[in-house]
Amino acid sequence: MTESYLRMVPTTCQPAKARDNTRLGGTRVEDRMEVFLERYRKQPPAYIIELEKTAREEQVPIIRRATRDILGYMLRTKKPENVLEVGTAIGYSALYMKENIPKTSRLTTVEKVEMRLVKARENIARYDKDKQVTLLEGDAAEVLKELAETGKKYDFIFMDAAKGQYLNFLPWIMEVLTCGGVLVTDNILHEGDILESRYGVTRRDRTIHGRMREYLQALKDMPELDTICLPLGDGLTISTKMC
């Protein structure tokens, strides 16, 4: 996404209105849009498509196609040297991002859930032929703290981990994000729950609901960040660190 385009988009992070779920012929409007736009979408490598299919079948949460498209476009145009992903899952998004950065660039991804780590290790070993991806195992907060304390810097960060922890991760994210670097945060709409009042969501989701709103407010209020919110996929923010 070019700078000229980004500056045309309002920097507010107020929740957008819920999408129109009007059904036409039994299918939601956005579903029909997805089918239509698929024919014009830049297709990823065959193994990425296969990983996506496997994840859907096994109900492993991965980034949605609209989010994937934005990530790919931004990475191809920005050409970051060092990319950090918080939340690896099975390695789908890490490998997709790897396909869209220069061969000389490096990508570090963090995951702590052992079940996902098993598949992530397998997929990265199999498909990362150029050895661009480094998988760090452990709690994201602890790993981020260590990265910051050892002086690591990243010019592109993708956050797709535990939604209720985004706000806790933010200070460390700011430490490792370079001046002019970009932070992309996924799932900010939390399946639409974020649009509801606190009492409009289930009790078990209220903590995440509140913390996500606090996180969005923090992004909006930080003078060192220029942030936009986009209602794509499950919602995402794009923040640039201004220095």
Language-model segments: which ranges?
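A short alpha-helical cap/connector motif
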Residues: 1-156, 163-184, 188-243
